[in-house]
Amino acid sequence: MQQAQAQGLPPATTGDITPEPVREGIDLIVNGERFRHTGDPLMPLLWYLRDVLRLTGTKLGDAHGEDGYDLVLVNGKAVSAIKRPMAKLAGARVTTVEGLAHADGSLHPLQQAFIDEDAIGCGYCTPGWLIAGIDLLTRKPKPSDEDIDKLPNRCRCGVQTRVRRAIKRAAGAKA
């Protein structure tokens, strides 16, 4: 306090101290629609999507984001929604599995390829596979089997071979 007075500053009062800054909100776009999150900035994106927006396609798997179940596109890149806090999403464009279809209702080519190749087991991992596949096809339009096998997704139903065929079909490559 003496140091503040020596610098010509008025002494602090308890009314001058705030435990955390006032939050105006985190603006983001989810599946083409604008939203403002005014809650906890440390809330993981996964819980915002599922609990606030009621977009339940993105799943929780191992709670560490290592299994690919929770993948979403953030500014066009696949990221783990459980690892991404809302504070890191200001101005971001988020696409979930619910936002992959076109405005006219037609499916994304990878969604159609999953249907055509019967690449759906129980369906729990399917949203993550779709997001990871779209990210891969954006980076590598003609992915190899090895590229596809390196995706972080896990499946307990054993559809990996059909997923590989679906991704190659969507890429226009021969399975």
Where are these regions (language model features)?
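Signature of N-terminal electron-transfer/Fe-S-associated modules in redox systems
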Residues: 1-175
